[in-house]
Amino acid sequence: MIGLVGKKAGMTRIFTEDGVSIPVTVIEVEANRVTQVKDLANDGYRAIQVTTGAKKANRVTKPEAGHFAKAGVEAGRGLWEFRLAEGEEFTVGQSISVELFAEVKKVDVTGTSKGKGFAGTVKRWNFRTQDATHGNSLSHRVPGSIGQNQTPGKVFKGKKMAGQMGNERVTVQSLDVVRVDAERNLLLVKGAVPGATGSDLIVKPAVKA
């Protein structure tokens, strides 16, 4: 089953009939418009390309304008692709709404995490700090040794060190679908999802459901 592209609207909470508070993320899922259908004969695999939202005319490049015009859809804020399962069929120009998730219980949500800038090992990797006193005057938050000796004579790839933290693609799996509001194009999922308010999210049925 394909997924949908939405926008993170923020977090709130809703109450069950028993008065239990459930923290939810509100995802605004405007209609996804199919801009291209890929098939085995021409592309080597089956997939659909979709867009959503709107883009100012002066922000649309000529190649984008031609692509959207060929599909007969309004220019959106980006292009995303979803692989098609056996038996799934879509047509160019078709509109897909949040009702796609009406019967789905759990979803996987992918987004770009908030960027934290250049961070040290304590913040980035949860390293322990060294002694605050007892003769330690310079090495409170340093990582310590990062290698061995002349052999191997290098720092191994993947070594946890200071650097850019956040601003990377993150997927949170198996979030409960609390409510699907087709009238307002809203999807409410339990818990937090990656990214800042207003950022784009890819929502798919959970692979581990």
From Swiss-Prot:
Residue span of region Disordered: 133-152
Keyword Ribonucleoprotein (UniProt): yes
Residue numbers bearing the N5-methylglutamine modification: Q150
Coiled-coil regions listed: none
Signal peptide: none
PTMs per UniProt: Methylated by PrmB.
One MF term in the entry's GO annotations: rRNA binding
One GO term of the biological process aspect: translation
Gene3D superfamilies tied to this protein: 3.30.160.810, Translation factors (2.40.30.10)
GO CC annotation terms, alphabetical: cytosolic large ribosomal subunit
Xref: SUPFAM superfamilies: Translation proteins
InterPro entries the record matches: Ribosomal_uL3, Ribosomal_uL3_bac/org-type, Ribosomal_uL3_CS, Transl_B-barrel_sf
Organism superkingdom: Bacteria
Keywords for the protein's UniProt record, in alphabetical order: Methylation, Ribonucleoprotein, Ribosomal protein, RNA-binding, rRNA-binding
Assembly and interaction partners: Part of the 50S ribosomal subunit. Forms a cluster with proteins L14 and L19.
Family as reported in the entry's similarity comment: Belongs to the universal ribosomal protein uL3 family.
Function statement: One of the primary rRNA binding proteins, it binds directly near the 3'-end of the 23S rRNA, where it nucleates assembly of the 50S subunit.
Name of the protein in question: Large ribosomal subunit protein uL3
Source organism per UniProt: Shigella sonnei (strain Ss046)
Recorded name of the encoding gene: rplC
